[in-house]
Amino acid sequence: MTAAALRRTPLHQLQKEAGARFVDFHGWDLPVQFSSIIKEHQAVRNACGLFDVSHMGQVWVTGKDALPFVQKVNSNDAARLKPGQAMYSHMLNERGGIVDDVIVSCFGPERWFIVVNASTREGDVAWLRRNAAGFDCLVDDQSDAMGMVALQGPAAKEVIGAVSPGAPALGRFGALELQLWGESCIVTRTGYTGEDGF
């Protein structure tokens, strides 16, 4: 795919100005490094690093049957989540095979937020919409309207606390809706680095 045909996140220009080296990741022009991979790895292990993960899918499921629907399509028990909690789960097909691994956040019995992987986003959203037939709920793909970053590392709690005083109080797999700089944001205490993060 040519560089002109690659999709770009809302942070692309800032990353370019910061000297990022970009790679094609499933049709997205994403930064693979800024200074050195080793320095950036050490930053995440010893302090913190910020990852642009806007390429991942961001899907709201809302409506009267949102909980029964989310319960149907996930391997873990969504009914055990209270508002403000999230879980790692798998979406399963009718044979029990894995469609994708996801993070599911509960913001009330009628409001759920699901983060799906970039490489399977379009298929995941289509699959969710097909499976929503018969449920009184809306599957709303907000992926192109939202950016997403991951702040990861032992100092992540301190750094996020400087801009969002409520976020550090979240427990592991906690979820919070808030306003930052006049914008609606979702903060979850999750990540894939093995370090603490948001």
What are these regions (language model features)?
Residues M1-F198:
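Basic, glycine/lysine-rich polyanion-binding surfaces/domains
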